[in-house]
């Protein structure tokens, strides 16, 4: 009887370990010595990856958007994005509140009522930034998203390769990674 119980426990443990190995990393690193003042200014969303079904459903209709990062009064960041939706420019602002180390923020979604962590994983401040967001939309609905921001509308091929490698390391598959096409709409200063 003890041998039978041990066998089942061993199989259960192997199953748990197998799931742990297959799961994407829950923690991502943050840009060392993150300098928030250098991160401010205009960025373009050049790439996205997400485990959310909306990306697969809407990715053909998505296009690049312009985002402006400005300091918030609480030491966090205001991330204001302007994008094309139903042939009109729409603007949304997210307040990223400081959450621990520099480069780590939290965001409370008014739509979902959930709080997400947002990390600046890597940036050179002049050309690109890799951001990673994670949280939960509800019970059992984990949400993960990686974003490639570029200072220009035409990021270099090496940056796209870097973003793809980062996404795959986080468990995203090719069909969940999209590079957003350029658009002339909603990109001018307003």
UniProtKB/Swiss-Prot annotation:
SUPFAM superfamilies assigned: Lipocalins
InterPro entries xrefs: Calycin, Lipocalin, Lipocalin_CS, Lipocln_cytosolic_FA-bd_dom
Impact after mutating residue 83 to A: Reduces enzyme activity about five-fold
Glycosylation sites: 29, 51, 78
UniProt xrefs under PANTHER family: LIPOCALIN, PROSTAGLANDIN-H2 D-ISOMERASE
Localization, UniProt: Rough endoplasmic reticulum; Nucleus membrane; Golgi apparatus; Cytoplasm, Perinuclear region
Domain comment (free text): Forms a beta-barrel structure that accommodates hydrophobic ligands in its interior.
EC number(s) stated in the UniProt entry for this protein: 5.3.99.2
Post-translational modification: N- and O-glycosylated. Both N-glycosylation recognition sites are almost quantitatively occupied by N-glycans of the biantennary complex type, with a considerable proportion of structures bearing a bisecting GlcNAc. N-glycan at Asn-78: dHex1Hex5HexNAc4. Agalacto structure as well as sialylated and nonsialylated oligosaccharides bearing alpha2-3- and/or alpha2-6-linked NeuNAc are present.
Tagged with keyword Disulfide bond: yes
Cystine bridges: 89-186
GO biological process: gene expression; mast cell degranulation; negative regulation of male germ cell proliferation; prostaglandin biosynthetic process; prostanoid biosynthetic process; regulation of circadian sleep/wake cycle, sleep; response to glucocorticoid
Tissues in which the UniProt entry reports expression: Abundant in the brain and CNS, where it is expressed in tissues of the blood-brain barrier and secreted into the cerebro-spinal fluid. Abundantly expressed in the heart. In the male reproductive system, it is expressed in the testis, epididymis and prostate, and is secreted into the seminal fluid. Expressed in the eye and secreted into the aqueous humor. Lower levels detected in various tissue fluids such as serum, normal urine, ascitic fluid and tear fluid. Also found in a number of other organs including ovary, fimbriae of the fallopian tubes, kidney, leukocytes.
Effect of residue 149 to A: Increases enzyme activity about two-fold
GO cellular component, one term: Golgi apparatus
Keywords tagged on the record: Cytoplasm, Disulfide bond, Endoplasmic reticulum, Fatty acid biosynthesis, Fatty acid metabolism, Glycoprotein, Golgi apparatus, Isomerase, Lipid biosynthesis, Lipid metabolism, Mast cell degranulation, Membrane, Nucleus, Prostaglandin biosynthesis, Prostaglandin metabolism, Secreted, Signal, Transport
Protein name, per record: Prostaglandin-H2 D-isomerase
The organism of origin for this protein: Homo sapiens (Human)
Induction: By IL1B/interleukin-1 beta and thyroid hormone. Probably induced by dexamethasone, dihydrotestosterone (DHT), progesterone, retinoic acid and retinal. Repressed by the Notch-Hes signaling pathway.
Keyword Nuclease: no
Residue positions of the active site: 65 (nucleophile)
